[in-house]
């Protein structure tokens, strides 16, 4: 959750301590050895860092340790942001980014005086920070007079959105966030009254509203339009968005209005429940015919007729509307989801020609404001939406054949419990040993038995008549390939 924030912390000790606090928050109990392994340091360093953290904890927080491990306790149900206020404010890079959000340029002498730094020390921190920002096509420009961002304004805002989203809804960084939040909830209420409401990620949308108003007030304007102001969806929502931004004294015009709408659209959920008016606009999208044909081809190729009755066409149209390439989004998608999507591609290699054909049609479309230039990124997003739909209509992924000799009532009970234990992606099918040779084996199929089987045709997991915890854990581990 805090991976981007940890990347931009330039002090090694603070970054390590923030990682430790995060681990302690996420685990009810954890050992020093486990902490050292995750943070990639020595146990001695962990002990030293824990002592430093203990001395800085706010009132109501404490660290307990015993033979079982270490616990971070909160005795008064306090907000975790109290911890971030202490540790993140010690980072020079975090403080610099915080100031550059609200102002176009930071006066170097003022920043040095406020943080008790020499120019040489600041220079070292900026160089380290720029090494992390370069992959996002951002840099901090620095001289003895001023500090400022170098990069596209859209990229700067997206970077801040992803950086701050885990923190801002609990008022970290800015105490007036709750005011923006109340304005945004009234905006959503007006949409419901006008029958324009859709399912959205509320924190996602509020954080966009928050950042956009701050950047506009700082005089940092969007230079290009990311969305057509003639689009029917834009024309529907623009009046309410203009009202929303006026609550913060911001008057949306042209490019800023288009960007504000694209940010609101960014918060829309897939598998949405659209009002009739919105659904009608989506179905009149210029790519709708190509997308319908694409879904029909998938349905025929996989012999899954139900695909045609799913939300996949609307999801793909929303993907095209929301589509935006940035180094930050591309890095997050390709690195975080790489393994899972690689498994998916191996499972459905026959779908690639259909996806490639759709991509070519999309690239040739004159209605696409945001063009597809990174094909890998587009395919990753496309694959996630297709796979989610496939698993919704056909959750079954593997069969576990169950050969069991024992008292029939116990066998029936055990079969029922194993079925529930394995979940709906796995089919537990009881068979007799004599039927094994007649089975058509598919990928991921397993055999579970409490008797020895000579030359089994598939992997076997042996269970005791009354299965042990270790046996069940092994069965669960092997069957989890059918899940995320």
Task: Report each predicted region and the residues it spans.
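A cross-family "folded-core" feature that marks the main globular domain of proteins
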Residues: 2-484
């Amino acid at each position: 959750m805090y991976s981007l924030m940890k990347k931009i912390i330039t002090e090694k000790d603070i970054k390590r301590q923030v990682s430790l606090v995060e681990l302690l928050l996420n685990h009810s109990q954890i050992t020093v050895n486990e902490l050292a392994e995750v943070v990639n340091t020595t146990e001695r360093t962990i002990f030293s860092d824990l002592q430093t953290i203990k001395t800085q904890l706010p009132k109501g927080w404490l660290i307990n340790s015993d033979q079982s491990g270490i616990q971070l306790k909160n005795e008064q149900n306090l907000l975790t942001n109290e911890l971030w206020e202490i540790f993140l404010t010690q980072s020079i890079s975090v403080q610099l980014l915080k100031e550059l959000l609200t102002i176009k340029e930071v006066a170097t002498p003022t920043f040095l005086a406020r943080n008790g730094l020499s120019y040489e020390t600041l220079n070292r921190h900026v160089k380290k920070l720029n090494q992390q920002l370069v992959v996002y096509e951002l840099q901090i420009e620095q001289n003895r007079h001023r500090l400022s961002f170098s990069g596209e304004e859209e990229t700067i805002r997206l970077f801040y959105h992803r950086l701050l989203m885990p923190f801002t809804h609990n008022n970290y960084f800015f105490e007036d966030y709750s005011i923006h939040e109340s304005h945004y909830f009234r905006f959503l209420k007006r949409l419901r009254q006008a029958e324009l409401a859709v399912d959205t990620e509320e924190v996602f949308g509020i954080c966009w509203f928050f950042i956009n108003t701050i950047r506009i007030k700082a005089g940092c304007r969007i230079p290009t339009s990311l969305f057509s102001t003639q689009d029917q969806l834009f024309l529907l929502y623009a009046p309410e968005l203009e009202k929303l931004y006026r609550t913060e004294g911001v008057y949306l015009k042209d490019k800023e209005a288009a960007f504000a709408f694209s940010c609101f659209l960014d918060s829309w959920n897939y598998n949405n429940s659209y009002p009739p008016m919105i659904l009608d606009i989506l179905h009149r999208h210029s790519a709708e015919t190509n997308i319908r044909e694409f879904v029909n081809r998938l349905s025929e190729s996989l012999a899954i007729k139900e695909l045609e009755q799913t939300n996949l066409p609307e999801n793909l149209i929303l993907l095209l509307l929301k589509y935006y390439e940035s180094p930050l989004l591309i890095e997050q998608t390709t690195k975080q989801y790489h393994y899972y999507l690689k498994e998916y591609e191996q499972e459905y290699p026959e779908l690639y020609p259909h996806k490639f054909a759709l991509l070519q049609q999309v690239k040739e479309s004159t209605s696409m404001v945001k063009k597809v230039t990174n094909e890998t990124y587009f395919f990753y997003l496309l694959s996630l939406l297709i796979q989610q739909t496939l698993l919704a209509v056909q959750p079954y992924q593997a069969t576990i054949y169950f050969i069991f000799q024992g008292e029939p009532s116990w066998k029936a009970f055990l079969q029922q419990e194993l079925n529930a234990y394995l979940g709906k992606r796995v089919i537990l099918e009881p068979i007799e040993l004599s039927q094994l040779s007649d089975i058509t084996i598919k990928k991921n199929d397993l055999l579970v038995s409490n008797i020895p089987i000579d030359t089994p045709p598939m992997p076997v997991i042996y269970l005791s008549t009354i299965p042990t915890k270790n046996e069940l854990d092994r069965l669960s581990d092997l069957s989890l390939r059918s899940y995320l």
